[in-house]
Amino acid sequence: KILETVREGVTGYDIEEFFHGIYNSITESAHVFYLASEGDYKKRTIKLIEILSEWTPHNYLISSPKGVDNATEKDLLVEFVEDPLFSAWEYIIPLQVVACMAPQDLGINPDIPKDPNFHRRIGSKNMENMNNPYGVEDEKVNSI
């Protein structure tokens, strides 16, 4: 959802996959969100933040407070339930908030598509019975 609303490339990695070489892509402009649920990898995630903080100032930890000794103003510490079957749902909610708030801060209106005629041009949606919600008049597009 963040990719759609912020309109920048976004991807997620398991921490072990990240260790295999993804870390090489981190630059000063990278924004890294860490989901540190309880378990074996939480300590390693915190250590990873220490290391990557040398490369980018944009590190955001989402976690329960247990085991987080040096929280920053960029961290979101929440008393999650941390149930192994439920925690995936808990950690989705903060990312949904980021997806909602970030475009506002960046001056992006996600309700306005980059190309209002994209689906007509590519033929990805049946547009025959739809109104033209953006009021776009384009003979080439409307003739598809």
Regions found by a protein language model. Name each.
Residues K1-I144:
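A SIS-like phosphosugar-recognition module
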